[in-house]
Amino acid sequence: MKLVIAEKPSVAMSLAAVLGATERKDGYLEGSGYLVSWCVGHLLELAQPEAYKEQYAKWRYEDLPILPENWKYEVPKDKKTQLALLCRLMKDKRVDSVVCATDAGREGELIFRLVYEYAGCKKPMERLWISSMEDAAIREGFDHLHPGSDYDKLYDAAVCRAGADWLIGINATRLFSVLYGVTLNVGRVMSPTLALLVQRESDIESFISKPFYVPEITCGGFTASGEKMTERSEAEKIRMDCDHNSAFVRSVEKQVKTIQPPRLYDLTTLQRECNRIYGYTAQQTLDYVQSLYEKKLATYPRTDSQYLTKDMQATAASLILWLRDNMPFGKGYAGEPDIDRVTDDSKVTDHHAIIPTVEIARTDLSELPSGERDVLTLLAVRLLCATTQVHRFEAVTAILDCQGYTFTAKGKTILQSGWKEVERIHRMSIRQSETEHKENEAVALPVLQEGQTFEAVSASLREGKISPPKHYTEDTLLSAMETAGAEDMPEDAERKGLGTPATRAATLEKLVSAGFVQRKKKQLIPTEKGKNLIAVLPDNIKSPILTAEWESMLKQVEHGELSATSFMDQIADMSRTLVKEHTTPEERFADLFPSSRGTAHEAVGVCPRCGAPVYEGKKGFFCDNRECSFALWKDNRFFSSKKKSITKSVAAALLKEGRISMSGLYSEKTGKTYDAEVILDDTGGKYVNFKLEFPVKKGRRK
């Protein structure tokens, strides 16, 4: 009997249905020689520093860098039951082999392997590697299972990725948080991405907008423009010289140009397009296309390829013909499908481009949630665009002379709409399409000939301002992340850029949730906290070049070209250097980090739970670590019952000594006052507890 382990319940249900495992059990399905169960995402996570040494529970410079020799893992409380079940199933005597059916990628491999190793399982392991959840694809995958050992290097790369994120995240976060007295979350991919946003914001803020002036002449139903100028008087002189005078055509140049169809979508280009057209965040798009994949309507989403493989050509051709004949935008499709244009086995590694599956023909799209419907429609539109005719037009450039000044008029005439007709029909059906269409609309010039003369032209002055750089949107930031550091890497480097298609969306969400970035409509704007963090970080942490190199090295680990040990040694060395080179806060950054919760710059004390600074707020004293719940409330029930409150001096004493001597404590029972030591008795729960300790009374002399 085979035990099949999927990444999530919905996928397990689909696999079980195809395999005939229809008998429901508690946490798994059984039947036809299979047990089918699931993980719920990561069942095991890298343990926090205090799991290695108790002293690491507090954030202290002298403990850095923290470099575990062997990784420890912990189980989230809400996942212990499922992990225990999988361990039991792996040890079941009926099970003679285990099939890894988690997502076919680096993270999916890590999710399964950690469970397999945690259970101490030694049974043969096989790998299901598919790019579609269609029944036929599942059957094909189970008919051709791969030896699990084929993916050992993929697992090594996954462990390295997680380990590198832990080492940089833990050490850099603690280092700069301790130095500057406020929690500063640093991440291997997150920080360079934030740096891109901060640099763009700096470029915008420092930009000095200057006006420009363009003299123009209108004649024969078209407008020709002169040279852009910065001096109004100069441009105005040209306008006055030309107005109501004659102009003649000095030259006419015609050139037939071709725009090739776009490539198919990989995850990043799909996320960019969805943000630009619909305003969806990268995470929303990933969620929608993941759901479509699980519903068997789209192929595997976490891909960086924009091509198909040769064995898909027949299926793709029949799908294209169905889309052409049944979808509204199919009316714009011309000619026979050119599948060869989107086929290249050498450019497909783990997974091919994202396309719809044939299940779309059996699905009522109106019943899908709007986000999923939008994404699936885009996938269908792109498949048609990528395989139909090229877009061809004639570009015309006319040079006119008026009073010795040169003016240029440009226009174009569509010769073959090609793929742009499919796109045009689709865009006309969605919101904000009219404006976009008009902006891209071709403007044809009248027939012009050299020497042609126009009498009494109308001259005018067009004014404008040089625009500053635009704020990043998720569309443009994803593009920047994809190419970051590419110019500093060799041409043959397999992976360039920040993060992977599968992780970029999560990186953006972390930046927002950590308070480093805020969304304003489609724009991503760094906050003051984000700007200040980038100000104090060293160049190698915030530079995309080093992180892009690491991504390329992880690919080398995956292919067996670099050992996991070599990779991790480099990360550890960087962690050591980081701590060694930053021993004290820089004076120029001293005032950048007032408490996000408090009113004073100075910390009241140190959190007894995590070692982060504690600041005074309006209603209490709070740990600055967002993940820590420690708080001393000013209007505390324990103190208020004794007609006292936690003042700043009381809080400081409790945090420093763990106790404070207080006089005049009120007794609700006797109505009298007394003196006692108040002791901070924190057990790590939601609320902080206190207890009293009374001074020992001296005995009477006999």
Regions found by a protein language model. Give the residues of each.
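Conserved short loop/turn motifs at secondary-structure junctions
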Residues: 1-3, 101-104, 181-183, 254-263, ...
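Basic, low-complexity terminal or inter-domain segments flanking catalytic cores
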Residues: 2-3, 90, 173, 282-283, ...
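Helical mechanochemical/support elements of P-loop NTPase systems and associated helical scaffolds
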Residues: 7, 11, 78-86, 104-115, ...
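Short, polar/flexible loop-turn hinges at active-site or ligand-entry regions and domain interfaces
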Residues: 71-74, 102, 122-126, 147-154, ...
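C-terminal or mid-to-C-terminal helical accessory/interaction module adjacent to the motor/catalytic core
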Residues: 93, 135-219, 254-258
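Metal- or metallocofactor-binding catalytic centers and their adjacent structured scaffolds
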Residues: 232-265, 271
